[in-house]
């Protein structure tokens, strides 16, 4: 199978925007990882995306992935020309998000009798079928993938999509890379950062923006520090300059108990140093950082929102609390930090849940089957793995 994978942005050519935000989006991470997983399974994959900068190449190979950047203002026309010439062997389409040029791929697929699958990885991407002509085209795909039950409900209620077309399937993570550390490994990692082996460590890893609940984090950590001066906070991620400044100020005001680490290439060591993950985000799909933390053995305190409620079950894999309620976050974080046995039990349950329903070894074959199906084949794979 030669799969055309369409995504709005991919390898845009700059690591950070002018205001400090990393330019690589969750959709881009998923596109890259899914392409690699599909290639491992013997499929050819071409990623079609926007060309945003003059200096980026129109076509190149990146890690074995054929990447084509489409030129403005005629991306749809260029896409159709390529599908009839340089990429005429494409016989299946996989769309992540709702890039405008993808409507031409959908129409082309229908004309040729090829399957087309659309995956939404965020609540904000849900479309209203009758809103405009593009939305009407997006509502005609062969199959749909929702990474959460909230997105599935949005497909049905707003997009008018038949339930039998919708598969609820995690985007997946590499559980062979995100692993629980040994006692010795955790001790060594902490020593490298000057953190006591006996300290209780809270971890936050996400973009430093308001939507991720950084303002709530700024409120909850002083509460935790006041109750447990020996606890430590690791803040991993780059983002808005003003919020980064406020985090550094908070670290000083809490006696240096918080480490503001900025953007890192590889977050695993920071998960492995931790005891509890905290995630006060305002809205999510299926949070990758939460999956990574859980796979690394951390129970979590999270906002009670879509996506998080597909992963965190109170008293079993962590706790859900009301969004923006800093006091509730602090209370549950302190409860977990002070309960070694409960923390260990919930961490083990978190690892088991992620391995059961979110590992690439579980997800990728199901993804490939949906993409190549010419008939509706919806199934709730997430629900099937939820026994905690």
Feature roles, as predicted:
Residues 51-52, 173, 205, 232-245:
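Glycosyltransferase donor-sugar binding loop
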Residues 191, 328, 335, 342-356, ...:
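A short, well-ordered alpha-helix in the C-terminal region of glycosyltransferases
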Residues 263, 282:
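Aromatic "clamp/platform" in nucleotide-sugar-dependent glycosyltransferases that forms part
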Residues 179-195, 366:
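A short helix/loop element that forms part of the nucleotide-sugar donor recognition site in Leloir-type
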